[in-house]
UniProtKB/Swiss-Prot annotation:
Organism: Listeria monocytogenes serotype 4a (strain HCC23)
Keyword Cell wall biogenesis/degradation among record annotations: yes
Family assignment from sequence similarity: Belongs to the aspartate/glutamate racemases family.
Protein name: Glutamate racemase
Its job: Provides the (R)-glutamate required for cell wall biosynthesis.
Pathway where it operates: Cell wall biogenesis; peptidoglycan biosynthesis
InterPro entries for the chain: Asp/Glu/hydantoin_racemase (IPR015942), Asp/Glu_race (IPR001920), Asp/Glu_racemase_AS_1 (IPR018187), Asp/Glu_racemase_AS_2 (IPR033134), Glu_race (IPR004391)
Any one Gene Ontology molecular-function term assigned to this protein's record: glutamate racemase activity
Key word Isomerase present: yes
Annotated positions binding substrate: D9, S10, Y41, G42, N73, T74, T184, H185
Catalytic activity: L-glutamate = D-glutamate
Enzyme Commission number(s) from the entry: 5.1.1.3
Domain of life the protein comes from: Bacteria
Lineage: Bacteria, Bacillati, Bacillota, Bacilli, Bacillales
Length: 266
């Protein structure tokens, strides 16, 4: 029987990481939990985000996952090291992979980070980037409206274009040549962000690099699945199953997927 890779996120954003993982590892089984009912995590304090992240973690661990991907930047910043220390399965976040990808892409060591308020205030990206390259200069920008645009399914709309243009205006006057999408919801807005920032700016989706690290970690722990056993992906949400399904079907190209509603916390 296949063991699944577990993914947790504040909502649908982590599906951008799932998509990249399934591209690279098509034999793997996925269990995904999106805490849509309590989304967004960005404005919440670190202790509350850590509590919610543990609740999601325990839910998936109880279902026998072999690895955990914290597919949410805010949750990674709040709880990754504590969870990694206490679980006996491999645990990975999305901040280090995104930082590594940005440093590969930049030509002038000037990098912008787009994130939730919680991720920006945590200084997790500047810390990670400077830990890998002390010469790098980082401009961080909180984009609190992006998550709600994605969660409402408006990420291809004229509203999305307006929100992106208004939010990213401060970055246009900087000399950054690389932008990290420091929230896993943001890749759904990537075409609009790329269009606004222009050809000279590389836009980094940490999902691709995260997927490569998932593959390497599974290989290291001898957990890679290459069998043709039947795959049964499972998707859980604390919010609307229909909204979740509409976005997930579009993003993952899984027309027959089912989504289960669950409750977390008290």
């Amino acid at each position: 029987m296949k063991q699944a890779i577990g993914f947790i996120d504040s909502g649908v954003g982590g599906l951008t990481v799932v998509r990249e993982v399934l591209k690279q590892l098509p034999h793997e089984q996925v269990y995904y939990l999106g805490d849509t009912a309590r989304c967004p995590y960005g404005p919440r304090d670190k202790e509350e985000v850590a509590k919610f992240t543990w609740e999601m973690t325990n839910f998936l661990v109880d279902r026998g996952i072999k690895m955990l991907v914290i597919a949410c930047n805010t949750a990674t910043a709040a709880a990754l090291y504590d969870i990694r220390e206490k679980l006996d399965i491999p645990v990975i976040g999305v901040i280090q992979p995104g930082s590594r990808a940005a440093l590969k892409a930049t030509r002038n060591n000037k990098i912008g980070v787009l994130g939730t308020l919680g991720t920006v205030e945590s200084m997790a990206y500047p810390t990670a980037l400077k830990g890998l390259n002390r010469r790098v200069e980082v401009d961080s920008l909180a984009c609190p409206k992006f998550v709600s645009v994605v969660e409402s399914g408006e990420y291809k709309s004229a509203i999305a274009k307006k929100v992106v243009a208004e939010s990213l205006l401060p970055l246009k006057s900087t000399k950054i040549d690389t932008v990290i999408l420091g929230c896993t919801h943001y890749p759904l807005l990537k075409p609009i962000i790329e269009n606004f920032m222009g050809d000279g700016v590389a836009v980094i989706n940490s999902g691709e690099e995260t997927a490569s690290e998932v593959s390497a970690l599974l290989d290291y722990h001898n957990l890679l699945d290459s069998t043709d056993e039947e795959i049964e992906h499972r998707f859980f949400t604390t919010g609307s199953t229909q909204i979740f399904k509409d976005i997930a079907k579009d993003w993952l190209n899984m027309p027959d997927m089912t989504v289960e509603h669950i409750k977390l916390g008290k």
